[in-house]
Structures are given as structure tokens and as C-alpha cells.
Amino acid sequence: SMQPYGNRNKRRKAKNFSPFVLFLQPVIRQLVLHMKKSLIALAFGTLALGMSEFVMMGILPDIARSLGVSIPEAGHLISAYALGVCFGAPLTVLVARTRPLKQILLALTALIAVGNLCASLAPNYWMLMAMRFVSGLPHGAFFGVGSIVAERVADAGKRTEAVSIMIVGMTVANLFGVPLGTYISNVLSWRTTFAIVAVWGVVALTLVRMWVPRMEPLPDTGLKGQFRFLRSLAPWLVLASVMLGNGGIFCCYSYVSPLMIHTSGFTEENLTLIIMLAGFGMFAGNILSLIHISEPTR
């Protein structure tokens, strides 16, 4: 029988999109089956952290120009955040290991908001560096505590998927949040970008308060017990792979804006698209890991 041209055209368009739909299908299925309000709150938290960490990459030239420092000096603001990450996780273990998990998450999300709000108001380079350090303090601790919470609220046999859903917020930040922050910095000011990250931190704080259930603290095994797992080789191998992988990414990504502008010849107006393409690569990598996350590793 004769098919109307319009119907054939619609089916052809749908067929063209089928590889993309198949690519996202496992992720969509996991979100539909396992998405809970508490996981949404955690994903909003990692989204705020992703913007807080990576937004510097797109606005680095604007900050250097505004504060009257060189690009390498402005790059130290990225290092200050990383230093805060290194100090924040063990500091949380020392100070809050006996506190309820929800209280810890509330304190960490509040610190995201406060750190970025103060960064938006920083009067000079050194104050901004201090606030970048403060903004980095909750990063590692939030992922650690958030992973425990995600595992506790997950359905039986779906703990890994629950943690992956929480981390989706970070990849969404790279895909949409960081390019948006770059665009806002170009149009308005880098201070406005940090203020928006602070607002997102407040949103995450509100959702954690409303949707994350109260949970008892982890059993207190003492300070030595917290690091007993480091006696075996496997954690050191994981730490080494993460360190090398992230080190390689940051060596390139930290200075993507000046490299694209001064070396490759792109304009500042192109930065938003470039940052978005980099974010899409991270997003695609997370999707691929989610697709294969339940498969045996050996």
C-alpha cells in the first residue's frame, strides 16, 4: 500500500536518531528505575561541585584581566581549589566521622554556597585564592559521604548504579553548567558566574535537607581504622590511576581558554562551544561507564 510521504519522512527522521537513543537507553532506564528523591538531591550537589571546580577553566582569562595578574598566576586559583580538596576529605574524617551523615552533607553543601558567594565578592587576587581553597574543602568529602548515602538508599543489588546516578550531576555540570558559566562571564562578569554557583549550592542544600533521609553515622573505628584499607595494594593502584588520569586532564583542561584563544586563534565567543564539546566528551564517558558498570571486571 502507498504510504503518505509525511509518515515516511517522520520514520526516516526517527531512524536517524535511533543510534543516539540506543546510546542513552541504558542511562534512561537506570534513571527511571532507580531515581529517588535522595539521589536527585545528591546529583544536584555533585552538579554544584562540578560547576565550582571546572568553571574556572572557562573564565580564567577574564579573572586574570580583571585582577591584573598573568594567566599562570590565575592558574594558581585552580591549584588552590585542588589543595582544598586534598585537605577537606581527611579533615571531615577527623571532625565529623561520628556525626549523622545527613548533617555532614548539609554542612558540606552550605560550604559550597558560602565559598562561591565569597569568591564572587573577593576584592583581590589573594582573597579569591583563599575562597577557592574554601570552595574545594567540601569536594572530596561530599563524594565520599554521598556515595555511602546513595548505597544505603539504593535498591538491593543496585548500589553501584545509585552511585553512578549521583555522579551524573558532575558530568551534567561539564556539559551545560560550565559552558553557561563561561558565557555569563563573557557577557556579564566572572563574579556573576561564581554567584550563580553559590545559588546552585543553596538549591542543593535545600534538596538535601528535604529529600535525604536521616541516617545514623558510620561505626566509629577510630582514626587508624579509617585508613586501615590502605594496607593492601589495590587501593594504592586505584589512587595512582585516578591521580594520573586527573593530572593529565587538568594539565590540558586548566588552560583550555588561553590555549584556544592565544595559541589556536579562536575568539572568546567560541569558548562556550569549545567548553561544551569538552563537557560532552566527559558526559559520553560517564554514559559508557554506566552502560558497562554491571559487567564483570575480569
Regions from the language model: what does each represent?
Residues 68, 100, 121-126, 265:
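Helix-breaking motifs and short loop linkers at transmembrane-helix boundaries and internal kinks
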Residues 115, 126-134:
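Paired small-residue
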Residues 288-297:
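Residue-level detector of conserved catalytic or cofactor/ligand-binding positions
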Residues 87-123:
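Conserved MFS/SLC helix-loop-helix module at the cytosolic interface between two early adjacent transmembrane helices
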Residues 212-238:
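Juxtamembrane intracellular "pre-TM" segments in multi-pass secondary transporters
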Residues 44-71, 253-257:
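Extracytoplasmic
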Residues 156, 165-209:
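Helix-loop-helix hairpin linking two adjacent transmembrane segments in secondary transporters
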